[in-house]
Amino acid sequence: MSKVKKQPKIEALQNVDITFTNVSYVYSPKTPYEYTSLQDINVVIKPGKITAIIGSTGSGKSTLIQHINGLLIPTTGVVDTNGFIIKAKQKRIKNIKQLRKSIGLVFQFPEYQLFEETIEKDIMFGPVHLGETKEVARENAKKYLEMVGLPLNYLERSPFDLSGGQKRRVAIAGILAMEGNTLILDEPTAGLDPEGEEDFIKLFQRINKEQNKRIILVTHNMDHVLEIADEVIALKEGRVFKVGSPFEIFKDKNLLQELLIEPPKIYHLIYQLQEKGLDLTNVNIRTIDQLAKKIIEHKEQKRKG
């Protein structure tokens, strides 16, 4: 009789890939409403990186990320998610709390999920529910409230007294307080003003750099993808269409047209420069300052002959 494989501890998961092998997912199978959302997905999401998942509406982005922490079970194929193996049509996932603790999922508009009477209790809820002691959860509430940019005197306030952006920070602090190695963000800047968007993007970068936390970002905002992503997974009609760096994705105008995706604003300028004879599509440019520097360098070279 074979021994049951022990599931890994979170602290041992810092360098573990998330792997999809031949994964498909069908909603409402064998009913008139049957719909195939994912088809034959084979992809690896590396640890310690920021990976963006892009695609037009209905391409399967949200379905894909819900397989990562076991909210959905694949119809076919296998998901190795942080060392937890989830197979097609599996009835239950062993040690599901351990999996959920290792992978935090922040849904779109997470502020609507706040419900406790104080911010401290809201941040503590997830860790305590997943087995953490109240003492440790209370200390982590302080730590992660400060990390998301809110002062400690907010702990005793009601979350319902906060602005929309502040509520979102509290919701993210609650996910971070579970201290997993992976943070999944589904349209995390939706509904925010430009300043609020930029604040959150910088926060995600800081979390990635300071904690070596894997971040998986689902977004329609290609400016954000260009700004922070190490790798991009592009989906089309439930299939992986292309995997590459943001530069490999955005330099290909035909690819973006097939995906029905608008390029980042900087790449609109890069395409215009290309039409005028200055091809910068093979240069890794993330910011307008980097673009300006390359244009100046080109002019200097041209002047010198």
Swiss-Prot record:
The entry marks the following residues as binding ATP, namely: 55-62
Q: Which domain of life is it from?
A: Bacteria
Pull one GO CC term from this UniProt entry: ATP-binding cassette (ABC) transporter complex
Q: Which UniProt keywords apply?
A: ATP-binding, Cell membrane, Membrane, Nucleotide-binding, Translocase, Transport
Entry EC no(s): 7.-.-.-
Q: What class of enzyme is it?
A: translocase
Q: Which InterPro entries match?
A: AAA+_ATPase (IPR003593), ABC_transporter-like_ATP-bd (IPR003439), ABC_transporter-like_CS (IPR017871), ABC_transpr_CbiO/EcfA_su (IPR015856), ECF_ABC_transporter_ATP-bd (IPR050095), EcfA2 (IPR030946), P-loop_NTPase (IPR027417)
Looking at the record, the residues that make up the ABC transporter domain are 13-262
Pfam families per record: ABC_tran (PF00005)
Membrane topology classification? Peripheral membrane protein
Where is this protein found? Cell membrane
Primary residence? membrane
Instruction: State a single Gene Ontology molecular function.
Output: ATP hydrolysis activity
Q: Per its database record, what is this protein's job?
A: ATP-binding (A) component of a common energy-coupling factor (ECF) ABC-transporter complex. Unlike classic ABC transporters this ECF transporter provides the energy necessary to transport a number of different substrates.
* NCBIfam families (alphabetical): ECF_ATPase_2
Q: How does it assemble?
A: Forms a stable energy-coupling factor (ECF) transporter complex composed of 2 membrane-embedded substrate-binding proteins (S component), 2 ATP-binding proteins (A component) and 2 transmembrane proteins (T component).
Q: Which family does it belong to?
A: Belongs to the ABC transporter superfamily. Energy-coupling factor EcfA family.
Q: What is this protein called?
A: Energy-coupling factor transporter ATP-binding protein EcfA2
